[in-house]
């Protein structure tokens, strides 16, 4: 038993005094640089970051700054430290405008912001920022190496914003808050013209306006039903084969029945 404990302690000491720990404690930056390259090859990014944090300030303004900066940013990105990777990539772009890695850094900085975008149900401040950063890259490098990927990320983020806006409007509708629902769906249709939720929004706008009309004072019903009819005509013109077509037709039949019964 005692021999086992001794061996265990020796193993722990061996690990604690291994090459990485030696480099971490060393005052020789060349030792740290060599270990960083080894760790990056082995994809041990967290350990590499620890060493980078020790030496990066000492190499700013030197011939090695450019190569170290891009490696540091990549290591941060691979550890999913996206706020810091975004910062380091953007700093690289500003500090090394003539670098061959400038386009790569510009894209990866924007992609770091993309990863900070929250799910659609939460605040989309980071999504807006990521879209702006990706658009900056696309504008700067329209035929760039990463342009296709950047456009794909933009589409994903726009879909997220579309969904958030649509779900907010739909929530008003389902809670029978027809005035804000109508306003929200109208804004959605204008502000999200290419959205996959467009026929959904157009249908719920009809339904919201129709139900709002029915809850109105008698003298206001005709005018509000006319607006629902206008929304219906737009809907069937744009989406004649929509999954909501039958429901929309039923609303229109109800509107016509109401007009007949009330001599409108």
Where in this protein do the model-derived segments appear?
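Sec-dependent bacterial lipoprotein signal peptides
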Residues: 1-17
């Amino acid at each position: 038993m005692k021999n086992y404990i001794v061996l265990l302690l020796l193993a722990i000491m061996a690990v604690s005094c291994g090459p990485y720990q030696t480099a971490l404690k060393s005052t020789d930056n060349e030792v740290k640089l060599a270990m960083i390259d080894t760790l990056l090859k082995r994809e041990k990014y967290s350990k590499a970051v620890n060493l980078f944090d020790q030496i990066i300030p000492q190499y700013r303004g030197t011939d090695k700054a450019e190569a170290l900066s891009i490696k540091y940013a990549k290591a941060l990105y691979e550890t999913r430290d996206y706020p810091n990777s975004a910062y380091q990539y953007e700093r690289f772009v500003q500090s090394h405008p003539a670098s061959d890695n400038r386009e790569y850094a510009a894209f990866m900085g924007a992609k770091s912001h993309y990863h900070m975008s929250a799910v659609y149900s939460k605040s989309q401040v980071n999504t807006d920022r990521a879209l702006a950063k990706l658009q900056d890259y696309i504008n700067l490098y329209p035929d760039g190496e990463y342009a296709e990927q950047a456009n794909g990320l933009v589409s994903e983020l726009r879909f997220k914003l579309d969904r958030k806006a649509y779900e907010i409007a739909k929530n008003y509708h389902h809670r029978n808050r027809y005035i804000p629902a109508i306003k929200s769906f109208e804004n959605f249709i204008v502000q999200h013209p290419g959205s996959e939720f467009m026929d959904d929004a157009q249908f719920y706008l009809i339904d919201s306006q129709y139900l709002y009309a029915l809850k109105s004072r008698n003298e206001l019903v005709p005018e509000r039903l006319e607006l629902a009819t206008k929304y219906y005509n737009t809907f069937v013109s744009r989406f004649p084969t929509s999954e909501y077509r039958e429901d929309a037709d039923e609303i229109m039949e109800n509107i016509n029945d109401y007009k007949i019964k009330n001599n409108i």
